[in-house]
């Protein structure tokens, strides 16, 4: 009969793994699902590996409504192959966690959270987000920079058509794209037809009123949401309308920071 192996000896190879699993998640104190915590070392390793990286700079232990909005955004990023969401926790006391990055980007802690969008590994020219810390507003801003995230009311096929419509230079080309969208309605699910028709309505308005219609309509709807008391259902419908309107903004446009 084989000699019995002492229990402690049989478990010894697992000790390092068990130690790692029982250790704190990371030194920054951040545990947001869908977001990658970065420090002064990993920041420079990770940013170049993704086409787009949205980085939130914040206190070491963020909380409250703005952090809740960020959590929703981080989870929603699962729908994008091009976008990585990350966060950097900063502390100006004790070990002065990640202060090097705070100084590099001239961050003011009174303005936390601060969002920067890095593209193609460019550390020197990130784009600052200056809108409201609301998941819908940030996603619309990202969409304006060519980053697609699944948003309520939006239909990928019609988002693509809207992009082609805005890039088209002549009236005839735009009319042709409008007709294409109308012809495609037959294949749209019944539950989505209302929103597909809204894309077509916006195309018609642009043909009639010009390029400024999407931006002015977004401003109008945003003011309605902010100032008027309305049911949650009505507010949700208006938010979907805002989401659809962003498909008609030229890539890199920043007018949607509302």
Swiss-Prot record:
A motif (Prevents secretion from ER) lies at residues 255-258. GO terms for biological process: negative regulation of gene expression; negative regulation of protein secretion; positive regulation of gene expression; positive regulation of MAPK cascade; protein secretion; regulation of endoplasmic reticulum stress-induced intrinsic apoptotic signaling pathway. Keywords: Endoplasmic reticulum, Phosphoprotein, Signal. Pfam families: ERp29, ERp29_N. One of its GO terms (cellular component) is cell surface. Residues 1-29 form the signal peptide. Gene3D superfamilies: Endoplasmic reticulum resident protein 29, C-terminal domain, Glutaredoxin. The modification Phosphotyrosine is found at residues 61, 63. SUPFAM superfamilies: ERP29 C domain-like, Thioredoxin-like. Homodimer. Part of a large chaperone multiprotein complex comprising DNAJB11, HSP90B1, HSPA5, HYOU, PDIA2, PDIA4, PDIA6, PPIB, SDF2L1, UGGT1 and very small amounts of ERP29, but not, or at very low levels, CALR nor CANX. This is Endoplasmic reticulum resident protein 29.
């Amino acid at each position: 009969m084989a000699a019995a192996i002492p229990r402690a000896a049989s478990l010894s190879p697992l000790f390092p793994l068990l130690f790692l699993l029982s250790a704190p998640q990371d030194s920054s104190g951040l545990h947001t699902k869908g977001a990658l915590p970065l420090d002064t070392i990993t920041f420079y390793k990770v940013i170049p590996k993704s086409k787009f990286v949205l980085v939130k700079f914040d206190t070491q232990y963020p909380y409250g409504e703005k952090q809740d909005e960020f959590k929703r955004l981080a989870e929603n990023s699962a729908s994008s192959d091009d976008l990585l969401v990350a966060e950097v926790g900063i502390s100006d006391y004790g070990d002065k966690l990640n202060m090097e990055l705070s100084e590099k980007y001239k961050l003011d802690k009174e303005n936390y959270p601060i969002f920067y969008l890095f593209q193609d590994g460019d550390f020197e020219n990130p784009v600052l987000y200056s809108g409201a810390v609301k998941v819908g507003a940030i996603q619309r801003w990202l969409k304006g920079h060519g980053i697609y995230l699944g948003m309520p009311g939006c239909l990928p096929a019609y988002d693509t058509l809207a992009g082609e419509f805005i890039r088209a230079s002549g009236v005839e080309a735009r009319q042709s794209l409008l007709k294409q969208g109308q012809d495609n309605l037959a294949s749209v699910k019944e539950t989505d037809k209302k929103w597909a028709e809204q894309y077509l309505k916006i195309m018609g308005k642009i043909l009639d009123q010009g390029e400024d219609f999407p931006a002015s309509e977004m401003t109008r709807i945003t003011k309605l949401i902010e100032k008027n008391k309305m049911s949650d259902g009505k507010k949700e419908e208006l938010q979907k309308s805002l989401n659809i309107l962003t498909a008609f903004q030229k890539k890199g446009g920043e007018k949607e920071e509302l």
